[in-house]
Design a protein with these regions (language model features):
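Ser/Thr-rich, low-complexity intrinsically disordered terminal regions
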Residues: 4-110
Length: 110
C-alpha cells in the first residue's frame, strides 16, 4: 500500500523554563511564527492563532500560553488529508519546527 503519508495529529505541550514572563513567551511564539512563515495573530489574552500556507495546503493552529507553558493545538487544515485524528506528516513537521524555534527564542538572552 506504499508509505503512509498521514500520522496521528501531534498535540504539543511545552514547559517554559522559570524566569520568563507571559509577555516574553508571547514574543518568542510570535517571533518563531515569523521565522517559520506562519501568519500569527493574537486571539485574546494568552492565546495566539497561527496559519501556515504552503502551496495549496494550509493549517490553522491555536497556541494558548502563559509564563510557564504553551501548547500548539490543531484547529483545522485544507488539503492535508486530515481525518480520524490523523493528518499529513508535513503538519507534524511544521509544528515541531515551530516548537523548536519557540524554545530557541526562549533560551536566547532576553
Amino acid at each position: 500500500a506504499g508509505c503512509a503519508r498521514t500520522a496521528p495529529v501531534d498535540q504539543i505541550h511545552s514547559t517554559v523554563s522559570t524566569g520568563h514572563t507571559a509577555e516574553q513567551v508571547k514574543s518568542a511564539i510570535l517571533k518563531a511564527g515569523h521565522q517559520r512563515q506562519w501568519i500569527m495573530s493574537e486571539a485574546g489574552p494568552g492565546v495566539i492563532k497561527g496559519r501556515l500556507q504552503a502551496r495549496d495546503h494550509s493549517a490553522d493552529i491555536r497556541i494558548p500560553y502563559s509564563a510557564t507553558s504553551y501548547s500548539i493545538n490543531y484547529e483545522s487544515s485544507l488539503n492535508l488529508k486530515a481525518s480520524d485524528g490523523k493528518i499529513h506528516k508535513n503538519y507534524n513537521r511544521w509544528v515541531h519546527n515551530l516548537d523548536k524555534d519557540i524554545q530557541l527564542n526562549l533560551s536566547a538572552p532576553q
